[in-house]
Amino acid sequence: MEEIPALYPTEQEFKNPIDYLSNPHIKRLGVRYGMVKVVPPNGFCPPLSIDMENFTFQPRIQNLENLDLKNRCRLFFMKQLNNFKRSVKDPSKLILREPYTIVEYSDSTHASEILKKKVYFYDVFSELIKDNRTLTDTTQSFRRKLKFRDISQLRGDISLWRTISKKFNVPIGLLKEIFEKYIASYYIFLHSLNENVHTALHADQYPKSLLSDDEDDFDLGPDSNSGSDFEEDDDDACIVCRKTNDPKRTILCDSCDKPFHIYCLSPPLERVPSGDWICNTCIVGNGYYGFTQDTHDYSLPEFQEYCKRQNSRLLPARKLSIDELEEMFWSLVTKNRRSSLTTVKYGADIHNELPGQITGFPTREFIPKNINGDELIDYLKYCDHPMNLTNLPMAHNSLLPLFKRNISGMTIPWIYIGSLFSTFCWHMEDQYTLSANYQHEGDPKVWYSIPESGCTKFNDLLNDMSPDLFIKQPDLLHQLVTLISPYDPNFKKSGIPVYKAVQKPNEYIITFPKCYHAGFNTGYNFNEAVNFTIDFWLPYGFGAITDYKLTQKACVFDMFDLMINVLDKYNKDTLLFNDAFVRQCYSSLIVFYNTELKRIRKIQAIVPRTTLLEVHTDPNDEDEEYDIFCSQCKTICSIAFVLRKNNYDSIRTYKRHKKNHLSIRQWNELSTTDSKVSILCTQDYLKSIQNLNNSDGEEPYIDDELYFTKSLKDIDSLIKQVGVKLDR
C-alpha cells in the first residue's frame, strides 16, 4: 500500500503552519492523499509535560472482532432472529448459537467431491433486501428507507436467487432451504411492518446494544474493571412516554430490560403477558453499538505496565515488524470466533481540565518542578510555539478564534494513550475541519486514509455490505465504532483509493477536509490531536451542514455564526482578511441567508406569533451551550426555529413568558425530554406542514410559535455595509 508523503518544513515554515499548509503544492498533496506527515525541523522536540502525580484516565475496552462491520451485522442478525423466536414462542426452540450454518454439497466439476461451506444468515438476508432500498430524497447518499417485498415475490425471483447463488457459490436449492428454515418467518414479520420498520424502534436516550450481554460474558483478565456501554437511566421511566407511574401495568423487555407501559405499546396489550416478552427494538434491532468504559482510573505508569502485560499476552518473543503487526491486527479484527474475543484498552478522547493534565505540550500553567535555567527558557519557547497543539487552532489565519470561545476536542486538544492493537475506527473530522495529531512518545501508530475522491465509493461499499444498518444508524460513520480492512478485496474492486502512514514520536499527521481515516497502535504510545481551519476549508464547512442533516449528526459549531463574525471583523477593519476570502464568505452567507429568509416568510404566513429570543451565554463556562438544534434533523437553527406543538390539548399549560427566559441548554432539553413539543428548523417545519396538508386528518398549527435567534434587521445591515466596502 502506498504511503502518504512526508513533509520537512524549514524552521521558518514550521513557525507559520497555516500559511505553510495553505501552499498550493501542499494542498494538492493533502487533497490527493487525504493526509500528510509533517516532520519538524531538527531541534524541535518538546518534552512531554504531564503532571504524573495526578494525571489519570479511564480507557475504553475494545472487542476487536465486534468492530468489524460484517462480523457485527452477522451477530446482530443472529440476536434478532433469536429474539423473534422468543417473542412468537416458536415451538421448534431453534435458538441459534452461531451466526451461520454449514452446508454440504457436491462440487459441480468433481461430483465425487463433497464441499463444506459456512453460509451466514445475515449475508443471505442482506442480498435479498439490498435492491429494495429507496431514496427518501434524491440528494441523499445514505438510503433511509427499506421496503420489504411480499415473500411470494421474493421466493419467485429466479434472477435474484441465481445472482446470490453465483456470489456465494452455493446451489440455489440450499440457499432457499436456509431461507425457509431460518429467515422466512422473520422476513414476514418485517414485511408486516414494511416502510414503518424504523417507527417500530423506540427512541431511547440510553440504548443498549444487542451484543452487550455477549461482551459482558467474556473475562477481560486481571486488568479488567468494565463499566457499561450505555449510561443507566436514573429511574424506571417507560421508554415511550417517559413516565414512571403505573408499575403494575409496566413490563420489562426480556432482552434489553427496558420498561414499557403495556398501553404505550403499538398495538397496546391488555395485560402483562406470561413468559418471555421482547420489545420491537430488540426484534428489529436498533443497530446500536458502543464501547464499554473501564471504571478503573489508570495513571500513566500503571497503564504502561498494562501495555507490557498485553504485549506478552498477544505477541511472540521475537520483535515483529510493522508489516507483521499490521497483518496480525487485521486478522484479529476480521476473524469470527465468538469464543475468544480479543480485548484491548485505549485511552481515547481524554479531556481532563486541570493544568498538567490537558495536554502533553509545555504550557505556562504547568511547569514541572525539575525544570530551571536554560531548560526553562527552552520550555517557555515551546509553550508559545504555533505547532504546540494548544496554540495551533488559534494560529495566524485560522478561523476558529472568531468564535471567541473554546470548543472541546476541536480548539482544545484531546489526549490519546494507546496499547497494542487498540484502534481508532473509520471517521471524518467534525465539520470536515483539518486535524493535527502529534506523537509524544511510544510505539508507532499506523494510519489509513481515504481521500475525498474516494468518499462516495467508500460510503456506497459500506451501504452495500450492511443495507439495513445505515437505516437504523444513519450517523454510523460518525460514531467511531466501525472497521473494514483496507486490504479487503472489495476496496480494490470498488476503486477506493487508500493510503497508509506509520507515525513515530515527534511526528505530526495532518488530515485534510473530508478524509476518512482509521488505524491502530502497535503498542504503548502517547498522542494528542486538535482541529483547525484554513481558508480553502470554507466550502467543506457548508457542505457538512447538508451532509449532517441527512445523517442526523449535530454540528459542533454554527457556520452562519462564523460567517457573521468574519464579516463583522472585516466591517470594522478591512485589513484583517484578504478581499478574496471575504468575498467567498460574503457570497456563501448571502446564499444561506436568502434561502432561510424565503422559508421564514412562508412560515410567517402560517404562524402568527413570532418572538426574538434574548439568550445570554457565558464563554468561560465549558458546559455552556451556544446553539439550538432541530429535534428532527439535528441541524443548528442559525436564524430561526419553530416550536411545534405535538399535543394540542395540553399545550396551553406552557406559559409563553417562561419560555422567553429559557437558556439554550433548557431549549434543547425541552425538545428532547418533553414529547409534547418539538423544535424544528425552518426546512423541517415546512415539510411537516406539507405532510399535514396532504393527510386526511389535518391538525391545527395555529398554536405553533416562530422564534428568531438573531435579528434580521442586524443581519441586513451588516450585509449592506460589507457589500459597500467590497464594491469600493
Swiss-Prot record:
Record protein name field: Histone demethylase JHD2
Gene3D superfamilies: Cupin, Zinc/RING finger domain, C3HC4 (zinc finger)
Keyword Plastid: no
PANTHER family: LYSINE-SPECIFIC DEMETHYLASE (PTHR10694), LYSINE-SPECIFIC DEMETHYLASE 5 (PTHR10694:SF33)
Compartments where found: Nucleus
Misc. remarks from the entry: Present with 290 molecules/cell in log phase SD medium.
Domain comment (free text): The JmjC domain is required for enzymatic activity.
Disulfide bonds: none
Pfam families linked to this entry: JmjC, JmjN, PHD
Species in which this protein is naturally found: Saccharomyces cerevisiae (strain ATCC 204508 / S288c)
Gene label: JHD2
Gene Ontology terms describing biological process: antisense RNA transcript catabolic process; chromatin remodeling; mitotic cell cycle; negative regulation of transcription by RNA polymerase II; positive regulation of transcription by RNA polymerase II; rDNA heterochromatin formation; regulation of chromatin organization; regulation of chromosome condensation
Protein family (similarity comment): Belongs to the JARID1 histone demethylase family.
Keyword Nucleus in annotation: yes
